[in-house]
């Protein structure tokens, strides 16, 4: 597993000397009342999307964040919890943990509401989390799991599943790629550490989550990320990489398979006021209803000429039914 050592070295260097845009992409910073993000945290934002969403953070959840970076998303999570050890940050790189501790001191100076004790930083491995079973409401990782190869990815997801409470949420952002990558790219340890050559197709990424037992999956965003071109990388063709934001919910697995929301909607436009499929789905006339892919398929299979099923937008924002 030498690629994991390479990854440690890359992020050890990034902790000692912040590298803007090292592996990821510049993301808009949440503008929240009374929240000021120190510049150093922004420079050390090694994520490829956002894992912080207010709808996940009601009722004072206990949050776990794996791969702390410069601490920016930990600070954002703490904004919602504002309690001692309300957010637990785990990282395998000592230098990154130390950098985050220093950054939290700066955050205290800029935010009167924030105390460093709101975040409990721990040395630990994503493959063996120092966290008790069923103790976390919201777990998060940003641009980390794409680095793992198949065996380690399974272990990392299983660990997140283990520590989450029933109905807890794993929120993630990772690069994905729908094209085949050659073995030279796949086996380049530095490119993998830089979140470039470990990207999976969305279907495989989602399957890794459902295989772990997550009964509900929400794909919340999908956007451009990187290009690997033949002039700069060992590839004969242009490779387009996207990033996605996903929530995997520790719901019981339905008998007919997981509920995967990819942004599809059903619209009934018939003569009646509504359509009821007698399976828990009521479509009010001319009102779009968000549905999971499984339900979308079942409605399409009815062959009706008064129900429209949209394509996946990959921007599911809640509501609807499965």
Regions found by a protein language model. Give the residues of each.
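Class I SAM-dependent methyltransferase SAM/SAH-binding core
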Residues: 59-128
């Amino acid at each position: 597993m030498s690629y994991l050592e390479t990854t440690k070295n890359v992020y050890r260097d990034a902790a000692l000397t912040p590298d803007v845009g090292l592996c990821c992409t510049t993301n808009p910073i949440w503008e929240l009342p009374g929240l000021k993000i120190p510049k150093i945290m922004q420079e050390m934002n090694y994520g490829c999307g956002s894992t912080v969403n207010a709808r996940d953070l009601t009722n004072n959840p206990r949050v776990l964040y794996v791969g702390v970076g410069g601490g920016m998303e930990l600070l954002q999570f703490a904004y919602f919890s504002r309690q001692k050890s309300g957010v637990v940050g785990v990282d395998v790189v000592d230098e990154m943990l130390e950098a985050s501790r220093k950054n939290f001191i700066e955050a205290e100076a800029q935010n009167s509401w924030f105390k460093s004790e709101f975040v409990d930083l721990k040395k630990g491995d994503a493959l063996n989390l120092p966290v008790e079973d069923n103790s976390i409401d919201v777990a998060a990782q940003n641009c980390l799991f794409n680095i793992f190869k198949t065996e380690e990815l399974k272990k990392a997801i299983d660990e997140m599943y283990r520590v989450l409470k029933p109905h807890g949420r794993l929120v993630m952002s990772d690069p994905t790629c729908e094209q085949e990558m050659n073995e030279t790219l796949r086996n380049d340890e530095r490119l993998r550490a830089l979140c470039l050559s470990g990207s999976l197709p969305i279907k495989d990424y989602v399957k890794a989550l459902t295989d772990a037992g997550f009964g509900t999956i929400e794909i919340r965003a999908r956007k451009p990320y990187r290009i690997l071109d033949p002039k700069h990388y060992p590839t004969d063709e242009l490779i387009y990489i996207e990033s996605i934001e996903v929530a995997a919910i520790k719901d019981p697995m339905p008998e007919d398979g997981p509920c995967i929301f990819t942004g599809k909607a059903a619209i009934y436009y018939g003569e009646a006021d509504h359509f009821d499929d007698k399976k828990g789905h009521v479509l009010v006339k001319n009102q779009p209803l968000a549905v999971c892919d499984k339900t979308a398929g079942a409605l399409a299979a009815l062959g009706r000429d008064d129900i429209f099923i949209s394509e996946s937008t990959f921007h599911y924002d809640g509501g609807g039914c499965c």
